[in-house]
Structure formats: C-alpha cells, structure tokens
Amino acid sequence: MSAYDSIAELYDPWSRSVTEDVAFYVEEAKRAGSPVVELAVGTGRIAIPTAAEGIRVIGIDSSPGMLEVCRARAELAGVAGLLDLRLGDLLEPPVEERVRLVTCPFRSYLHLLDDDSRLRALGAARSLLVPGGRLVFDVFAPAADDIEETHGRWLEREPGIFERADWDTNARTLTLSVRGEGGATTFTLAWLSPDEWRALLEKAGFQVLGCYGWFDKRPYRGGEDTVWIARRPR
C-alpha cells in the first residue's frame, strides 16, 4: 500500500496552491509531442492540463487510490481518452513505449532514499527515451531558515489540512506528516545538492542540458529549488 492511498481524496485540497509548475511541464510536453510519460502522475494535477492540450499521457503511479482519483478527474475534464494510467513505480515503470519526454514532477524523486535507488530510477527513465529524448524533473534542498521555521510543528497548509516537517540534517531527510478530515499519512523524503544530482544524471548516462532555479528557466544561482532537463545522448 502506498503512503498516498490514505490521502488520495485529500491530496488535491492539500496541494491546491501548487500551480507554478503546471505551465512549464505542459509546454515541455507540447514541445515533445505525444506520447509523453509522467512518473508519479498522482491525481493528474499536471497530466490533465497536458491532455487538455491534445497530448497523450502515459501516467505511472504506485498508489491505486491516487490513480482512481486521477481517472475520475480526467472523466470530468473530458480527457480520459488521452490518459493511459498504469500502476507502477519509479524503479520499474511498466512502459514498453519509447518516448521523447519523461517527466517526474513535484519533487517525486525525493522519495528515493539512497543513491542505488536513484541511479536505478534514472536508468529506468533513460530506458524509456528515444535517443535525444529528455528527462525533466524538479527537486529541492531546504534552506536553513525553512528548517528552523517548520521543524517539529504542526502547521495549517490549507484550511483544515495540517502538515508537520521533521528534518534530519545529518541524514538529509524530511519526514512529512499530513492530516485532515479526508485522511492522514507520513512519508520520508531525502534531498541532495545540485552537484550530487548532476553527478547521478551523468553516471546514469544523461547529458545535462539545464539546471534552473525556477520554472521560468531562470539560471540556478543558489536557493532551494532546482529544475533539471537532461537528454539521452543520440
């Protein structure tokens, strides 16, 4: 059972304020053309707007509950025919097709807690790409003031939805707990520096095309967020 199953109905209200990445990923998909693969597709926060642009999305997620919500949302949006939703994970995505774009939005690679699993996941993403195809994803590494302001405290993220961040700066992990009327869960994320992500991408056989500081592709000059575009060499 995925940690997200118990908050599948809560997920959209919990993440409703996260919108800054949607247009970026939609544009990347339009540039690549159908089909695209979205890893950790969740409830379709990005996949459904992508499909609304006429792009076929192969969406992979390890949570049956999240996929169920995604299917229902896609039906309401009138794009269910463009979404091919499959149960699977980052390490072995069940995709036989080879595509020009694989995405892994909303920091989902941070669920991988060691370099072995990170390399496995990056290698799996690479195997889905045609030569010249691109992997696009975003991650973060927390700033000291964020850790200080949030550590060990229940904070109301959205009305009636609370989250608690427990940071371990030695292990570089975040244990995040979420609770609301629709459910509760706890999961662990692990962060790396940009230099470490670059090294892993290169070790996995990618050529890094860009490391940006935000979804408008501003140059990375320090800060918490990094947005990566990497290519499978031809």
Tell where the protein language model's regions lie, with residue ranges:
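A short acidic, Gly/Pro-enriched loop at the edge of an enzyme's catalytic core
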Residues: 94-101
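A short glycine-rich, Lys/Arg-flanked "PGG" loop and its adjoining helix->strand segment in the class I
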Residues: 119-131
